[in-house]
Design a protein with these regions (language model features):
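Hydrophobic/aromatic-rich core segments of domains that either
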Residues: 1-4, 15-24, 29-123
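Solvent-exposed strand-loop boundary residues in beta-sheet-rich modules
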Residues: 76, 165-167, 201, 257-259, ...
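Alpha-helical and coiled-coil interaction segments, frequently adjacent to or embedded
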Residues: 80-269, 273-287, 362-363, 412, ...
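Glycine-centered loop/turn motifs
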Residues: 158, 190, 384-387, 420, ...
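Hydrophobic beta-strand segments
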Residues: 159-164, 253, 307, 371, ...
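Disordered, acidic Ser/Thr/Pro-rich linker "stalks" and the adjacent N-terminal cap
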Residues: 224-288, 300-370, 374-383, 431-447
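Short beta-strand-plus-loop segments that form exposed binding edges in beta-rich domains
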Residues: 294-300, 425-432
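Short coil/turn segments at the loop-to-beta-strand junctions that recur within blades
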Residues: 407-410
Length: 447
């Protein structure tokens, strides 16, 4: 049934903010975000007697968004999570599967209070006051539990298990404090968490962050007596950027005297995946050329965020007189050529066909010196000219600053980082996608 639903298609669109839509509308209009996708599966499968639910996590351990998926209620008392648009159903965990942390399900009946009086306690985050919300993490991780040490507690006697997202702690589980400890049942292993509590209406750190391994917390405890040098390239996990950058391997840049490129000179070839988005390609042509050709690999689309060519002894980029392709461009694609030179590092030109060649007519011959080349990316690399601040997590003290930096290159350097610390790089200039990370063998490892 899931395979059949996939053949009927679904258009992903994240800008909706609507209540659940009815089955007749969704069966006719297959559009929405992950929740609508799950609603379709629920309507169809329940109609033919297949017991499924829709589960979700409120805060993602690895992303900034809430996420829904379908869950088949199995005879093993565990669920089989799936999304019919993504991959076939499987009981086996998938590689690179999204981390969940804690899993919840909206039910039709009022659920028992986790803590007596919690539904009426306005000091508790709304997630835990939802009377129809059920914690079903036990159906995913039935044997995973953790006891954490608390260096700070609140007067209400409650503690939270939190995820650090968009610059703040977001609670995903609640429990009652026992002395200076807190027990949390059914939490996903190999995920990093922050113990926290409510102080004056704000969710604040109550101890050291940790990764759950073998039902025990592996704490990030910074050693302030041992400082190390670090080099930072990003503020957020790579995700699909690895693929986007890798798609440029094999592209060629050539120069020629004539539009037909009867006698081209190879100026540059990308032979390895770029490490960052902002790349200066030094070229050393034998002579001046009027025409420059950008050739994508035969099996790849052009996905180009920024492209500027600079001639010797000229500080301003060359403005091409005309840009054409090796095939007729549609009106939309001709218009989108401007995205390669709009100073927006997220927008990008995407070719209509794989293996496309773009030809830049410079108007007259120039001897090129270098090219600014920026593939499609998420702009979470170090952005030149932006203001950054690096923090380390100090348990109940929260985040401690290690200093501000103005980015003058594609990397930031700090020589005062406590060994073993959990870090957070904040960009004051733009964006909200930021995640905590630690250093391992000189490289950033994001949580």
């Amino acid at each position: 049934m899931a395979d059949y639903l996939k053949t009927e298609g679904f258009a992903h669109y994240n800008d909706f903010s609507l209540p659940h839509l009815g089955p007749l509308f969704l069966l006719d209009s297959r559009v929405g975000y992950c929740r609508e996708n799950c609603d379709i599966a629920t309507y169809v499968m329940r109609a033919v007697g297949i017991p499924i639910s829709m589960d979700f996590y409120e805060i993602a351990p690895s992303y900034n968004r809430k996420h829904f998926w379908s869950a088949l209620i199995d005879t093993t008392h565990l669920v089989v999570p799936f999304n019919y648009e993504e991959e076939p159903m499987s009981r086996k965990p998938r590689p690179n599967e999204r981390k969940r942390g804690k899993v919840y399900r909206i039910c039709y009946g009022v659920q028992p209070e986790r803590i007596k009086g919690i539904f009426e306690d306005k000091c508790v985050p709304p997630l835990f006051r939802h009377p129809f919300l059920k914690d079903v993490t036990n159906e995913y991780f039935p044997d995973s539990r953790v006891t954490v040490e608390l260096d700070r507690t609140s007067k209400d006697g409650k503690a939270y298990l939190s995820i650090f997202s968009i610059g703040q702690l977001r609670a995903i589980a609640i429990t009652e404090v026992k002395g200076n400890r807190a027990d949390f049942d059914f939490v996903e292993p190999d995920v990093s968490y922050f113990p926290s509590c409510m102080i004056e209406g704000k969710n604040v750190s109550a101890g050291y962050a940790f990764t759950l391994k073998n039902n025990a917390p592996d704490y990030f405890i910074p050693d302030t007596t041992s400082l190390v040098d670090v080099t930072l390239y990003r503020k957020y996990p790579m995700r699909s950027n690895v693929k986007n950058l890798g798609n440029t391997c094999g592209l060629k840049i050539e120069g020629a005297d004539t539009y037909d490129f009867m006698k081209p000179e190879l100026l540059y070839e990308v032979v390895d995946t770029p490490k960052v988005n902002y790349n200066i390609l030094k070229v050393n042509p034998k002579k001046k050329y009027r025409y420059i050709r950008y050739s994508a690999p035969k099996d790849k689309f052009i996905e180009l965020a920024e492209w500027r060519m600079y001639a010797e002894n000229i500080s301003q980029p060359i403005t091409p007189q005309n840009i054409t392709a090796d095939h007729p461009l549609s009106e939309l694609h001709r218009k989108n050529l401007d995205l390669m030179d709009d100073n927006d590092w997220v927008s990008f030109y995407m070719s209509e066909v794989v293996g496309e060649q773009l030809i830049f007519d410079l108007g007259k011959p120039y001897k090129l010196d270098h090219i600014l080349f920026m593939p499609r990316n998420d702009d979470n690399f170090i952005h030149l000219g932006d203001s950054y601040e690096l923090f380390y997590h100090a348990g109940a003290q929260g985040w401690i600053s290690l200093g501000k930096r103005m980015a003058e290159d594609t990397e930031l350097h700090y020589d005062n980082v406590p060994e073993g610390a959990l870090l957070w790089l904040h960009n004051y200039t733009r964006g909200e996608e930021e995640r905590a990370f630690y250093m391992k063998q000189g490289k950033q490892v994001f949580l």
